[in-house]
Every structure is written in structure tokens, then in C-alpha cells.
Amino acid sequence: MSSSLQSNRQSLNRKVAVMGYPHVGKSALVLRFTQNIFPERYESTIEDQHSKHIAAFHRDYHLRVTDTAGQQEYTVFPRSCSLDINGFILVYAIDDRKSFEMCSNIYEKIVRTYGDTSIPIVIVGNKTDLSTQRVVRAEEGEELARQWDAKFVEITARESNRVHEVFELLLREIEISRGNLSPTERPNGNSPKRNPFKDDGKPCSIS
């Protein structure tokens, strides 16, 4: 494709939301993806909107990301997540059992709001850099993903490449759900020779 055609190629708009219990690293995940920074100090998020242009699957995307405020119980589903969201990232911390359990509550709210169990979801077990404090096994995240027909990965938001892979995985699921992409296609247009979501030699399913 010529450079003139590439410059005139229109970006496809997609909206995603990042949800989870307080203190699990949602904002760190979003800031690492959109600005390539990692906040060392925790600051409570009310709600932030971010965006990033990315190229994947031979297309250009304008990805709008809603960084939601963490709730203790999620008795009220965020209004910003009730309309026009194409996919969700549900984040828990591997050192926080309550945050993992809260993912089920959030999932139920998503299904109830959208009336659809097939909406693209990626479950993220964050803070693998705190592996010595782990209380949630990777197998538990994998099982939850199987139950929901979702995707599951474990990462640390400190690693930029891994964070980008999470958002590309969700984007891939969104495009598959819209009939725009083959399930075997990856961001570079090739089928992978290895599982791209392995952390320090430990298996992490994409189920």
C-alpha cells in the first residue's frame, strides 16, 4: 500500500473499559498502555478517559479506554460502561483474593447490562512481580475464563510489552466477534509459533 493511501486510511473506533476492585493496578495498566508510564504512587481514580492509535491486523484503530473507579462491591454499574463498550478488561491482583472474587460480580453486572454472555472479555491477573505474595493461583483464573468463554493472562503492569499484548488480545476478540477477523489471525497477520503470554517461564492460558 502506498504511503498516501496509508495516510488516508480511516481509523476504526473501538471502546473498551477496564474494571476491577480498588488497588489492583487498573490505572497503571491503562497508563502503561496509553502513555508508556508506570505510576509508582497509588492515587485513587474517579474515572478517566484515555485513547491511543494503534495498528494491528493490517488496520488502524483509535482505541478509547475507560479507566473506571474501583468499587468495593459494584452495587452500581458505571454508567460510562453501560453504552457502546466493545469489550472489557477485568483486572484482579494475584495477591488479593477479594479482588479475584469481585470479578464474578462485575461479570454478572456486564451480562445483565448488555444481555449478552458473548461480549469480549479479557481477565487479567496483575502484579506478577509480587509472586511471593500470591494467593490466587493461575489455574483459578484459567478456570474462570473457561466458564465465561473469555481470555486470561497474567502480567505485571511494569512491563510495557506485556500490557500492549493484553489490549491487542482484547481488540482481536472484538474484531472476531464483529466478523472482521479470523480466529487464527494475530496482530502481525501470522499465526503464532508460541504462546505469547508466558511470564517468566510459567504457563498462562489463552483459553
Curated annotation (Swiss-Prot):
Major location (coarse): membrane
Propeptide stretches in the record: 205-207
GO molecular function, one term: metal ion binding
Claim: Isomerase is one of the keywords in the record: no
Phenotype reported upon loss of the gene: Inactivation promotes nuclear redistribution of dve-1, induction of ubl-5 and complex formation with dve-1.
Positions with a binding annotation for Mg(2+): S27, T45
UniProt-listed SMART domains: RAB, RAS, RHO
CC annotations in GO: plasma membrane
Entry EC no(s): 3.6.5.-
Subcellular compartments: Cell membrane
GO terms for biological process, alphabetical: positive regulation of TOR signaling; small GTPase-mediated signal transduction
Ranges spanned by the short sequence motif Effector region, renumbered to the chain: 42-50
Membrane topology: Lipid-anchor
Modified sites of kind Cysteine methyl ester: C204
Polar residues bias locations: 180-193
Keywords on record: Cell membrane, GTP-binding, Hydrolase, Lipoprotein, Magnesium, Membrane, Metal-binding, Methylation, Nucleotide-binding, Prenylation
Compositional bias (Basic and acidic residues): 196-207
Region of interest: Disordered: 180-207
NCBIfam families: small_GTP
Role, per record: Binds GTP and exhibits intrinsic GTPase activity.
Family from the record: Belongs to the small GTPase superfamily. Rheb family.
Designated name of the protein: GTP-binding protein Rheb homolog 1
Taxonomic lineage: Eukaryota, Metazoa, Ecdysozoa, Nematoda, Chromadorea
Gene that encodes it: rheb-1
